Amino acid sequence: MEIEFIQNLEKFCIGLQSNKSNERETSEQSILTLMKTPQPYKLCFNLLSKSNLTIAHFYGLLMIRDSAIREWAALDSQTKIMIIETLFQYIENMNSMNFLNYATKGQSFNTLGVIIKRSWLDNEKYEIGKGQMELNQIVMDRVYQYIDSGSPDRIEISIKIIGSLIIEFSSSSKAAHIQLSWEFHQKCLITFQNLHLQPIFRKVLELLQQFKDHIQQVPSRLTDQSFLQILYTSVKVFTDILDWRFLESGSSVLAYITSFSGGRTNLKPTIEWISLFTPSQSGGGISPIVSLVFGLYQLVEKVEKIPNLLRHAMSQLCGLQGPIIKDQKIKNQYLSEVLTFTNKLIEKSITTRNWNEMEDISNIIYKFCNTYKFSGIACLPNQIVIPFLQYTTQFVLSSLNLMKIWAKHGEEELEEEFENDCFDILLRSFVSLISDAEMLINRKRVDQLENFKEQYQVLKQCTSQIYQNYIQSRLELSEIEINKSNEELEPTCKSRGGIGGAEDEIDEDKKKYDEQLRSVAYIGRLNPGQSLELLKNEINRVINSLKERVSDPILFESLHWLLIFAGHLIFDAENKTPSAIPNAIEDYTFEQCKLTPASQVDGVIDLCNAVFRFHMEYENPLLNNGKMDTISPLVSQTSLWFTSGWSLVYLLPSSVFNVQISPKIIEAYGTEQPLLSITDYFINKILLNLKCWSGDLDVLKATSNLLNSFTLNKELCKYLIRSPNWSRLFFLEGISLLPPSVYGQLFKAFSRVVFSFPLSTRREYFIQLVKTLVEQMDGVLGRADFTKISQEAKIKENIYILLEKLNGIVSVSESEYVDDEDDCLFLTVDLFTKYATSLIAMIPLYDHCNDIVLLILRLFSNFTKHQLEYLNQDRARSIFPLIIQLFNSVATTSSHKKTLDSKEYYHRVRMMVKILTNIITFGDQRNNCPTIISETIFHAINIITPCLSNNDLLLYPKLARNYFMITSFLFGADNIQVKNIPVINTIYSLIEAGILHHDLEIVKSCFECIGCLTKSLENSKEKSGGLVDPHYQSVLIQFIGSVINFLLLQDFNVDELLSVASETLFSLMYSSPDGYRSKVIELITRQDPSIQSRVVQQFETLTIIGTDRKSKDLFMKNLQNFLVNVKSLINKK
């Protein structure tokens, strides 16, 4: 039988390497069958002693491992010790087996490591010498003997065994799944950590110290490949131990589980490790680990692979936390030593061109700065901290130079990768230091730090260098890009700054460098005066040069970036509504106002004036002379983006947002006469842009966005309408046809202005706003032959424009401009209602024109989002039936349109779901029309559910989340009988599928649906005197099974989903205890008989003792423990 087993396995292994797919598949299935052989240990060890086929050895070792995992509890003591002893012998003899490859050798250590862990908690005693020992003691004694043997071969074996044990006992992502409880894994980790991790680490540390001494004495050892291999293996084990997630002895199982959530964590050894990490007086005040890592690195930094591991170790040492450095004196000593070594490392790396090295050092710097921040280093001597700041600054500047070198040599991908992986991290390092330093200043803790003043001053000097060099480097990089483009493109479209530039480039630049720009702006604000002056001078220089060298693409590109830098410096670019002045800028301008003469212009005002010179001195004169081809659309967009952001922060600045506004800023941007001049100028600017940039949609969008930014400030609207040119803009006098989307944005802004008028005149101005619109709508829709002429190009163009204008008007909520419901005139509601039916009737006519259909849907979406707040019952009765008409029209038209693109169909359905989401979330606080709303949702969900389920649209997470939110609302409605929903069975199926979705929010939404359903059932039971509808009873039992299966058979995010899953299971068990018991029995009967009693005992801990919050919290706690004890036992097949 043994010979036949060897022959068969070898034959199947050879078959795996066949060129014929059917032979490979047959061989794979045959090996899988062999792998299920009960207790194959003697067969496998016989194969390992006789076969010369490396792949056969690989699968033999794998079979030993998997069988031992599966059968360990049933094996007798002699078999267990035989397996481990024979594996040790096999590993010792591997060097004589020249045919073994790297993977097979690695599998031998993996097999031994996994079996050692599986046997770790065994209690059997074995006769060893004169005493008795447990199996784990026997194993570890053997490992210690190997590492102390002095034999290079045995030392290497011990290191590799230790490496395998670290992987398995740390439960890393590479660890084998041995199908035991979390409690078992936790006990293994803590006992291994407490008994062996530190002794092993000390021996590895001692071994590495010996290697270091050998290298110093005999440098030629670095050319010995055998020596380098064992050195690499030892350093790898060393770094793996530094990655260990330490647990205190009394830690709960839940603490063990949650320690693996998230990414890589900081090094946090227990207090017992203090002598290894902190400086000792006997060792000359030097930490053994720190001195070894940095000292060994200096010797091997030219060797392959090993330096990378040591730099990772440095990163871990630069993030050391926990009880061993809790004492401030010890912490300061440790940080001083680490920083001393790190300074030498950074200084030496300033001139490096090694990408991997720079990435690692960037991470080391970031780890140190982000962990200890400025408060950590401010306690250290200046002679250590100041060089660190200066060397790190030089490293950043060197990185900028390296990026330029790569860009010049055509290695743009390498430059971009470096920016993403290294440079952003370096900038965030300084952001961490600055934010912490500012916090110390704000909390008045500076006096407690002896060296804060000097170090903070150096930090300011360093960040000033970084900001200035970053600005210059970004301009140089853009120039390099332009020059390369000029070599490839025709003269008419040489730069993206010219007419031939790509669309949306300003957004592309801001998104691509978003993280960088925010970090750089934060750094620049530490020296606001210098940063403002730098940008002002650069912008003035470029504009002066532009006036001399009109249309110069490099100047356009430079100005584009300078405007972006200016915007990020003086306001937060993500602002979409009126916002505060950034604190650093506000404080600086306020203080400067007190220190400088009244005649001296504020730095922010100076910078803004420089930016506005582009409009006034360059762009506007050329536009007035019809020379659009000499202006960069990109720079025009960027200048408008800057002006929009500036207006939200500085124009009529709010004392609500800002504590101390500079009087000079108030005088320039917050008093009547300047405001009238500013608003009049920009109204003229908007008119000029609308007139002259009619061929560039992006500039027109940026122009209309500027007007919207102005109108977001209700107080500023009063100044807009006082402009002599307001009526020209309001009635678009002298403006030729604009793109439809621009009309939408303009009418949105006009509506805000109209609603800012007093109630007495609001209706009059609203009528003026919509007069032309109404005439055109009536003129088009009122024609008897509209159906006949509807497909004419001119008619369709008019329809686009009218729908965009309506969307703009409907997007402004009248309720924001009134204090009370009684003051609402419902001007927009009445306008919408007048044309809603006609617009719905247009959908079949324009079914082939998806843009028009989507515009109509967007109109209804905007209406339901912005116009429902004060809706009374009478108006609701006339409006909500229109929603059902709309849905029926879209669903009927779309369903039979076979040529409709799936993307177009998705967008239509998405808009319908959005409309329903708006309806259920607008918040009917006055309870004006709850019945009408729930009835609308009832009818609408029957229309959209087939649209979703028949087209797999629930694969789209956002769409699915909103759909289940709507379903929860419907399930919770008092006047709706869930079982009467025609598509209810489809909804149930979708909920069950949603529970297994990869998106956390979808899973939560599905649990909430089930929760709402159980509440609905409880309400119906109360109304019916305790009677349970059979429909609901069967559905609840079905969902009980689904929730139990989710908890036990699915891997899920405990932090995010356990609470809502517990709440759902609690309500299901309370509503249907018999159904819960039936599902538990069904699950248990599917399990192996050997574990059934254990599972039953655990299920008995899940009981409900009450329905209050305390009882639910206790239930969730019991559920946590239940999952810890049961989940790993359950058969998932």
Swiss-Prot record:
Keywords annotated in UniProt: Cytoplasm, Nucleus, Protein transport, Transport
Signal sequence coordinates: none
Similarity section: Belongs to the exportin family.
Classification of source organism: Eukaryota, Amoebozoa, Evosea, Eumycetozoa, Dictyostelia
Originating species: Dictyostelium discoideum (Social amoeba)
Record-given protein name: Exportin-4
PANTHER family, alphabetized: EXPORTIN 4,7-RELATED, EXPORTIN-4
GO biological process: protein export from nucleus
GO cellular component terms attached to this protein's record: cytoplasm; nuclear pore
Function noted in UniProt: Mediates the nuclear export of proteins (cargos). In the nucleus binds cooperatively to its cargo and to the GTPase Ran in its active GTP-bound form. Docking of this trimeric complex to the nuclear pore complex (NPC) is mediated through binding to nucleoporins. Upon transit of a nuclear export complex into the cytoplasm, disassembling of the complex and hydrolysis of Ran-GTP to Ran-GDP cause release of the cargo from the export receptor. Xpo4 then return to the nuclear compartment and mediate another round of transport.
